[in-house]
């Protein structure tokens, strides 16, 4: 059985209104397509916690600050729909650019604080694009719950902040990062890795897990992070954009483990930018 594909806000809202009349809870999983097991785990979580699940598919041009990255982003709607069908998702909402940003569109949602630093420092305008499209998707779907992966941890904080600040009643549900057997965090960008780079790519997670372990043992942050950065570069990565310890709850920079923390990294390998993060246990 195929998943119904909706293209317009009008169609979407009519379907959701029918569900509401039946007293059904609605979940949404926002994606840019090129679905992998990480996305599908979000869909399964949504199906387990709501009555009707909308998966959105929109490659959002406003969150790309590099035209080449936007052009190279995989677009696989037919394959995505085929992956969703056996799971039982109730709708694939796949608007085009004109539907999402009609002529004259002139509003940007900008979340300060948690959007600054980390990815925000290297991708100017990215989180404005994320915040704008997510705000629209939450308002369009009227979902009770929205499901996001922890792999995009800064994005998760941005989305939580905008729902609080704008009084959007959708509850944001964080789901664990899904990894390949070799540890590499799943990403739609992984398909762009060459065979050699794919072999080396898991060393990013390896360095992250090793660093998190050393921090949990009490090794000073000022010693652990430079060593981890060196290990990533030695593994075949060309650049480490950032490798930082931040507060789990507010993304504030940390110099020690005096509260729940998260280790976050972004690095380039073979022209592909990969991100990852891990929670760090406090020393016993």
Swiss-Prot record:
Cellular-component GO terms for this entry: cytosol
Gene Ontology BP terms: pantothenate biosynthetic process
Catalytic activities: (R)-pantoate + beta-alanine + ATP = (R)-pantothenate + AMP + diphosphate + H(+)
Residues given in the record as beta-alanine binding sites: 63
Entry GO MF terms: ATP binding; pantoate-beta-alanine ligase activity
Group of enzyme by EC: ligase
Classification via HAMAP family: PanC
Subunit structure and binding partners: Homodimer.
Cited function: Catalyzes the condensation of pantoate with beta-alanine in an ATP-dependent reaction via a pantoyl-adenylate intermediate.
Miscellaneous field: The reaction proceeds by a bi uni uni bi ping pong mechanism.
Name of the protein: Pantothenate synthetase
Organism for this UniProt entry: Chelativorans sp. (strain BNC1)
Organismal lineage: Bacteria, Pseudomonadati, Pseudomonadota, Alphaproteobacteria, Hyphomicrobiales
Gene, per the UniProt record: panC
């Amino acid at each position: 059985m195929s998943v119904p594909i909706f293209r317009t806000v009008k169609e979407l809202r009519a379907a959701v209104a029918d569900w509401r009349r039946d007293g059904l809870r609605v979940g949404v999983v926002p994606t840019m397509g090129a679905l992998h097991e990480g996305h599908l785990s979000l869909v399964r979580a949504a199906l387990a916690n709501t009555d009707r699940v909308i998966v959105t598919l929109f490659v959002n041009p406003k969150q790309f600050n590099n035209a080449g990255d936007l052009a190279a982003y995989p677009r696989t709607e037919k394959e995505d729909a085929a992956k969703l069908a056996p799971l039982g998702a109730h709708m694939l909402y796949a608007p085009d650019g004109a539907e999402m940003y009609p002529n004259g569109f002139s509003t940007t949602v900008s979340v300060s604080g948690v959007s600054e630093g980390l990815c925000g420092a290297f991708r100017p305008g990215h989180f404005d694009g994320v915040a704008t499209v997510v705000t629209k998707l939450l308002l369009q779907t009227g979902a009770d719950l929205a499901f996001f992966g922890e792999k995009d941890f800064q994005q998760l904080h941005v989305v939580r902040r905008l729902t609080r600040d704008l009084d959007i009643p959708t509850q944001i549900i964080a789901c664990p990062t899904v990894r390949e057997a070799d540890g590499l965090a799943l990403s739609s960008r992984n398909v762009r890795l060459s065979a050699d780079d794919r072999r080396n790519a898991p060393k990013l997670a390896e360095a992250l897990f090793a660093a998190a372990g050393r921090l949990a043992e009490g090794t000073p942050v000022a010693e652990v992070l430079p060593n981890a950065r060196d290990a990533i570069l030695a593994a075949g990565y060309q650049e480490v954009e950032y490798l930082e310890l931040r507060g789990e709850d507010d993304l504030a920079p940390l110099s020690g483990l005096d509260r729940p923390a998260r280790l976050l990294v972004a690095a380039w390998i073979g022209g592909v930018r990969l991100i990852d993060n891990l929670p760090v246990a406090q020393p016993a």
